[in-house]
UniProtKB/Swiss-Prot annotation:
PANTHER family: NUCLEOID-ASSOCIATED PROTEIN YBAB. Gene3D superfamilies: Nucleoid-associated protein YbaB-like domain. This is Nucleoid-associated protein amb4104. Its main location: cytoplasm. NCBIfam families: DNA_YbaB_EbfC (TIGR00103). GO terms for cellular component: bacterial nucleoid; cytosol. InterPro entries: YbaB-like_sf, YbaB/EbfC.
Amino acid sequence: MKNLGNLMKQAQQMQSKMAEMQATMAEMEVTGSSGAGMLQVTLNGKYELKKVKIDPSLVDPSDVEVLEDLILAAFNDAKAKAEAAMAEEMAKMTGGLNLPPGFKLPF
């Protein structure tokens, strides 16, 4: 019975740490770029777009498709950086515990 009590206490501690990490990660900002840094997007830890910077030389009304592709590439770059930062924080919190592929925690 004592082991069950310890297990419950550990689960509560882990839940508390998860809540702290979620709050920290939500405030984190990452910037992705494309076009040699001429286009940048900034996301927060919830993948919400916070900022877009476009070098004026990229704006060509006759070739909007290039600008669209650069925005998409910059967004995907920022998203990958956010995911990597979250994975790193998760590894710190779980002590390097290898979670199964596709296992997602509630955030």
